[in-house]
Structures are given as structure tokens and as C-alpha cells.
Design a protein with these regions (language model features):
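Active-site phosphate-binding/coordination module
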Residues: 28-131
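Acidic, His- and aromatic-enriched active-site or binding-groove loops in soluble protein domains
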Residues: 121-150
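Short, basic/glycine-rich phosphate-binding loops at helix/coil junctions
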Residues: 7-8, 12, 72-74, 158
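Intrinsically disordered, proline/serine/threonine/tyrosine-rich low-complexity regions
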Residues: 154-155
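Short loop/turn microsegments at loop-to-beta-strand junctions
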Residues: 2-4, 61
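Asp-based phosphoryl-transfer active-site loop
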Residues: 4-20, 44, 93
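A short acidic/small-residue loop/turn micro-motif
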Residues: 22-24
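Short, structured loop/turn "capping" segments at alpha-beta junctions
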Residues: 103-105, 138-139, 158
Length: 160
């Protein structure tokens, strides 16, 4: 039998968002297991960076990843390709954002690095008015946003 490769997008295809909480539906997990049991391979093909492909996604049984809109490719745990933005370009963007008081984050294989005010701002957007709304406060206290939990705040963004 001929082996096939099945490519899944992440957002809205493999991963669902129910009430702001990302998860892989059981039906998708079963489909991946069945596909792999037939000897086929399962790859992710997504615009997400490596750092945004959380463990709960990979635990479904993924054979490879085409991430960052094609800027990152791995088979198993072996990186085959990684297209980086130059340090000069990163520094230019960071300087512009900081000078103009933009909140932002920088994606890399090693993490999602947030500007100093971004996490607080995103918590308000994702969780709601947690200071005045009891439901928003309960959600805020759970800290159940994979994205917010992945953000690393307070690191130097400029690169040499």
C-alpha cells in the first residue's frame, strides 16, 4: 500500500476554540490515530511559529511540521529548514514599535517574546473585565489561555 501524507492546518481545522480555550476535539484525535494506523503520515501546515505549536497539539501524533507560513520545517524532531528574519530587521521593527508605543511580540523557535505591556493588555482582551466581572475574574484566575501563558515578558528584544 502506498503511504500518504495528510496535512492539517491548526486554527479552525485541527484546533477548535471553545469559549477562548483552544483544544483538539476527540474526533480529530481519532482521525489522526486512524490515519497513522493505516501507515500514513500526519503533518501540520500552519502559519503558527514553532513556539505557538503547543504540546497539546503535538501530543495528537504529529509526524512533521511546516510552520511559520513555510519558514520552518521539521520531520519528527529534526529541523530541516528555518528561515530567520535578520537581526537588523528585528532591531528596526523593535525600535519602531517602542518609539511609537505599540504593544507587540516577537516569534521565534525558542519562544514568544512580549513587549512590556502586552500581556496585561491581552489579558483584558481575552479574559474580559476581570476586576468587575465575576465570570471574567474566574477565567483570569485559571490562566487558561495557551497563548498568554506562552508569552515571555521582560526579555531584551534587540539582537546583535
Amino acid at each position: 500500500m502506498e503511504k500518504k501524507i495528510i496535512f492539517f492546518d491548526v486554527d479552525g481545522t485541527l484546533v477548535s476554540d471553545t469559549g477562548g480555550i483552544e483544544h483538539v476535539p476527540e474526533s480529530a484525535k481519532r482521525a489522526i490515530a486512524l490515519t497513522r494506523a493505516k501507515g500514513n503520515l500526519v503533518y501540520l501546515c500552519t502559519g503558527r511559529s514553532k513556539a505557538e505549536i503547543y504540546d497539546f497539539i503535538l501530543e495528537c501524533g504529529i509526524d512533521g511540521v511546516i510552520g511559520a507560513g513555510g519558514g520552518y520545517i521539521e520531520i519528527g524532531n529534526q529541523m530541516l529548514y528555518h528561515k530567520k528574519v535578520t537581526n537588523k530587521a528585528v532591531n528596526h521593527m523593535v525600535d519602531y514599535f517602542d518609539t511609537n508605543n505599540f504593544d507587540y511580540y516577537v516569534e521565534s523557535n525558542g519562544g514568544l517574546f512580549a513587549s512590556k505591556n502586552l500581556v496585561k493588555r491581552l489579558e483584558r482582551i481575552i479574559y474580559g473585565d476581570y476586576e468587575n466581572d465575576p465570570q471574567a475574574k474566574a477565567r483570569y484566575e485559571k490562566k487558561d489561555s495557551h497563548f498568554i501563558n506562552a508569552l515571555i515578558e521582560g526579555q531584551e528584544m534587540r539582537r546583535d
